[in-house]
UniProtKB/Swiss-Prot annotation:
Cofactor note: Divalent cations including magnesium and manganese.
UniProt-recorded name of the protein: Mitogen-activated protein kinase 2
Chief site of localization: nucleus
A biological process from GO: mitotic cell cycle G1 arrest in response to pheromone
Protein family (similarity comment): Belongs to the protein kinase superfamily. CMGC Ser/Thr protein kinase family. MAP kinase subfamily.
Organism: Pneumocystis carinii
Length: 351
């Protein structure tokens, strides 16, 4: 069936009735729909990736990883529309759970209570514990990638930039596609620490918590230099130990050229916040990635005590770096090679 909503054509099976366009991105559009046999409301994400290799790679990562994880706080793929044949295959249709809104919209339209902040951060960290136990870095955690429903259930989405945490690829390759929103980027990414760890996701969670507490982004940098300045305006000039933790000589010289800055207390920035929230925030936003808490440690923090249950915070089996073999050889893959990989991935799900 070809359905249209706002002049958008969705070539999906007759099992689905398309309702409304609910989101648009660089290479995709999302509609709400009803799965007629079950009556279930779903979201259908239409992706047209074949114009750019980068979009193909993102689509492949997203499909493979969302199929791998089976977690309450990670969006799942219910189905993928099977193409008629390889030759005419030009669009990917992912059928997913329907979530009503996202954290970006919620923060923009209402003040969040402390209870909301607790519950949302708990769910983000619960998802992150599973991802990190599987040796996956999300690399693009931000409010718009946190989907919410009316019950305040939270699900992390958009794994298009995800990577193996044990990858052998060098940092320059790791960064090639790094277009993650600057405001949630850890300082080591800008200072080229040479190796990137699970701590980059933890930093993003800290930025999200800060934004939930105040309703505004904590570090809304206009460019690379401004971003770093805003971080140092709050955290202060790095200690000698943290300074020498920066492997890049050029980055160290740049930091040394900046005027000395004193640390600003989070209590003065967020005067109405729960002190326990601010204590967790300090641990999430440590300048030195080696000193940041892990997702598992953060879940045990007193701020999250109302929700923490060690028996209900599942891990996931580690993913072999070979899962991302296509990423390692991506420079030698043609768009047709990538199309074949995506086609095979879809057919394997439908089998």
């Amino acid at each position: 069936m070809t359905a249209s909503s706002r002049n958008v054509r969705f070539n999906v099976s007759d099992d689905y009735e398309i309702l409304d366009v609910i989101g648009e991105g660089a290479y995709g559009i999302v509609c709400s729909a009803i799965h007629k046999p079950s009556g279930q409301k779903v979201a259908i994400k239409k992706i047209s990736p074949f114009d750019h290799s980068m979009f193909c790679l993102r689509t492949l990562r997203e499909m493979k990883l969302l199929r791998y994880f089976n977690h309450e706080n990670i969006i799942s793929i219910l189905d993928i529309q099977q193409p008629q044949d390889f030759e005419s295959f030009s669009e990917v249709y992912l059928i997913q759970e329907l979530m009503e809104t996202d954290m970006h919209r919620v923060i923009r339209t209402q003040d969040l209570s402390d209870d909301h902040c607790q519950y949302f951060i708990y769910q983000i960290l619960r998802a992150l514990k599973a991802m990190h136990s599987a040796d996956i870095l999300h690399r693009d955690l931000k409010p718009s990638n946190l989907l919410l429903n009316a019950n305040c259930d939270l699900k992390v989405c958009d794994f298009g930039l995800a990577r193996s945490a044990v990858s052998t690829e060098d940092s320059s390759s790791f960064m090639t596609e790094y277009v993650a929103t600057r405001w949630y980027r850890a300082p080591e990414i800008m200072l080229t620490f040479k190796e990137y760890t699970k701590a980059i996701d933890i930093w993003s969670v800290g930025c999200i918590l800060a934004e939930m507490l105040s309703g505004r982004p904590l570090f809304p940098g206009k460019d690379y230099h401004h971003q770093l300045m805003l971080i140092l305006d709050v955290l202060g000039t790095p200690t000698m130990e943290d300074y020498y933790g920066i492997k890049s000589r050029r980055a160290r010289e740049y930091i040394r050229s900046l005027p000395f800055k004193k640390r600003v207390s989070f209590a003065s920035i967020f005067p109405r916040a729960n002190p326990l929230a601010l204590d967790l925030l300090e641990k999430l936003l440590a300048f030195n990635p080696a000193k940041r808490v892990t997702a598992e440690e953060a879940l045990q923090h007193n701020y999250l005590e109302p929700y923490h249950d060690p028996d209900d915070e599942p891990t996931a089996p580690p993913i072999s770096p070979s899962f991302f073999d296509f990423d390692r050889i991506k420079d030698s893959l043609t768009k047709n090679d990538l199309k074949i990989l995506i086609y095979k991935e879809i057919m394997s799900m439908n089998n």
